[in-house]
């Protein structure tokens, strides 16, 4: 991130962050289906007479259709919003449009790859998942260094997203080849199955509420910061997101390995083991974040100075508050997985998901009232604590 920030500059980094974030907002749809795909494949694997092949072929069909629908939405509403509503310097608008198209293509590729990624996680092939994750990071680092230090004269905000597209294609092809080779169900062709579609659609509709809340809390807040303060504050938000992702990644990887076990133990009827996983997983993931969050919160300014040199205004406050938000949110992650495993998520999503959606309107009211940008994180902490009580 330091190289990217120095390479692009604060203004272009803010553009890259806010335009990419706008595209990511549409992940609300794919996230709902991704959760359904992971749940149903894992559940079928946990059953003695399960049929993961039918789930996978149906999921692949749905994601291909979804990719086409999302592409249409981006090229109509998305382009209009980018050019008419977002606060971007006029002289960088053509480049912002290119970043938008590159982000759209990367997003479409990721949608199509969701069933294959879900299959790897459901089969608990964490060695492959970790290897491809490391490969993605290494490729990104190589591309960043190339763009930053290449002895050519080009617009870095055009070349960098182009290389990210290439990286995304390579990673998704790797998942495709691995799944086709090792998992029999992944050799099925896309197929519409009315029975599985009905179950997955019903699950996804209710899960849509939680995904909407997550997108509004993340990229929705990023959009609000752009509308009220411009791209410089978006750059600070991007820095905070990067730090938070690095810290939360430890707990996230732990949860990725734990979640299939919770779902499979429920499918097999082993409730005692499931509850022990929920309890230990919640405590361990909280401590994983806490170990890194405390020193970072205490020495945020020094860490950012060493890491980035000159960092955007509000970065220190944003990092500290975003880490606090993560500590509150991580407590309930295993409970969410357990509730998802049952397939009965309507009441949960209406209560907790509905509460989480309040992040966006409450943040808008706070900013409209003249509060500082940091107020959006205070709102997130208060809403998160309220959800724990539910």
Model-derived features with residue positions:
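Helix-terminus/linker motif at the lipid-water interface of multi-pass membrane proteins
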Residues: 1-12, 83-87, 148-152, 215-246, ...
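Alpha-helical transmembrane segments of polytopic membrane transporters and translocases
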Residues: 2, 14-30, 61, 205-206, ...
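Helix-loop junctions and terminal segments of transmembrane helices
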Residues: 2, 31-47, 122, 184, ...
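Interfacial/gating helices of multi-pass transporter permease domains
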Residues: 3-25, 157-161, 195-203, 224-245, ...
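Interfacial segments at transmembrane-helix termini and the short loops linking adjacent helices
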Residues: 80-102, 297-327
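Membrane-interface junctions at transmembrane-helix termini in multi-pass inner-membrane proteins
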Residues: 108-135, 145, 179, 323-354
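Hydrophobic alpha-helical transmembrane segments
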Residues: 131-182, 203, 244, 353-358, ...
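Interhelical loop/hinge segments that connect adjacent transmembrane helices in multipass membrane
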Residues: 154-161, 173-218, 261, 268-276
